[in-house]
Regions:
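Structural motif
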Residues: 32-34, 69, 110
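Exported/periplasmic cell-wall-interacting domains
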Residues: 59-64, 80-199
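Bacterial N-terminal signal peptides that target proteins for export
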Residues: 1-7
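Well-ordered beta-strand positions in beta-sheet-rich domains
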Residues: 25, 46-48, 69, 127, ...
Length: 199
């Protein structure tokens, strides 16, 4: 029993020593309903998403998507199958197929976000996630209750790329305005770490 407690304590200690992901940056455009992921300023991929149908903001119980600078605080769902249902961040054992009628649970993976500014300070306590949804037919239009929804296959890819601590920027502007260098077709170099434009 003591050995198990020791191993558990050692595991928790090592997990807390993992360096935050400073290599990746997620940028979400609520205007375009798109998400871009960058690796040291180089665009890796873009995905269609769905943000809140109630608009933007971070008021408690508002069901709105917060704007500004956030970070990935926790990752939940390692190795879960596509469509695996989560309730209170715990797998239920149920699998839901895309576009199942009458179903709208959180599925596949969860990236739990923490706000880094006053304008999004409630995000973590409001359980704002980037997560999979079975309502894939609604991806590309505002349909969520505050979270950022993705197709299950897309959230698995994103989940495998980013780590805890990865920066997340949510803007109203188009991605081309929010990411320096994207308009010219050039990625932002590691030396050019200009902040993302927030409009």
């Amino acid at each position: 029993m003591r050995r198990n407690n020791y191993l558990l304590l050692l595991g928790l200690l090592l997990a807390s020593c993992v360096a935050p992901d400073t290599q990746h940056h997620i940028v979400v455009s609520t205007r375009e309903q798109k998400l871009a992921v960058l690796d040291r300023g180089t665009l890796m991929a873009t995905y269609p998403v769905s943000t809140s149908k109630f608009g933007l903001g971070d008021y408690l119980r508002s069901s709105r998507t917060p704007l500004g600078q956030l970070e990935v605080a926790k990752k939940i769902g390692d190795n879960a199958p596509l469509g695996a249902v989560f309730k209170d961040r715990v797998r239920t054992g149920e699998i839901v197929a895309p576009n199942s009628p009458g179903r709208d649970p959180i599925v596949t993976r969860i990236l739990w976000l923490r706000g880094r500014e006053a304008q999004n300070a409630n995000a973590f306590g409001r359980y704002i996630y980037i997560h999979g949804t079975p309502e894939e037919r609604l991806i590309g239009m505002p349909a969520s209750y505050g979270c950022i929804r993705m197709r299950s296959t897309d959230i698995v890819q994103l989940y495998n790329i980013v780590g805890v601590g990865a920066a997340v920027t949510i803007v109203e502007a188009p991605l081309i305005s929010a990411i320096p260098g994207l308009a010219s077709g050039h990625s932002m170099s590691p030396a050019n770490t200009a902040p993302f434009v927030m409009r």
